[in-house]
Amino acid sequence: MPPLASCTVAVIGLGYVGLPLAVELAKHQECVRTGEPLRRRVIGFDVNTLRLEELRAGHDRTREISPSELQAATGLELTADPALLAQADVFVVTVPTPIDSAKRPDLTPLEKASATVGRALKQRRSATTPVVIFESTVYPGTTEEVCVPILERESDLRFNKGFACGYSPERINPGDQEHRLT
């Protein structure tokens, strides 16, 4: 993987977790340690085109991000085009995991996102090893038992050989303006 300062990061799912993360990554275009400019690119991917239109107009219906914060995220490219994901070095999956009527997690959004990322991995032309990070709230074992097999099937790559994978859940309280990601 190239250094984080110059890699392309794709955030998949621009809801309560993904949008603040994408904005934060995109607004820091200078290394805090050295002051040198960063060459990092951030792709914000969502399948909801209405959501993307609202964000482009400076409106976040979740109220997690202000219009000025959206405007300051100059390195953020919003898209619903999965083909652009093939340009990423790091994939951060932040899709929702709602529960069904029996209070079981519905992994459908996570499975669909994993398949989308897997197809992007297959289309990549970079020699660097891509990293896929799951931040969706799931039960133990989901990454290894559900997500990784989908990534392998869709990409024709093998875990820890063709791509790396990890899990890092975000702990946020939607609507809490005092305790935010940053």
Segment roles from a protein language model:
Residues V93, A164, R171-T182:
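Dinucleotide-binding Rossmann-like beta1-alpha1 core, especially the glycine-rich loop
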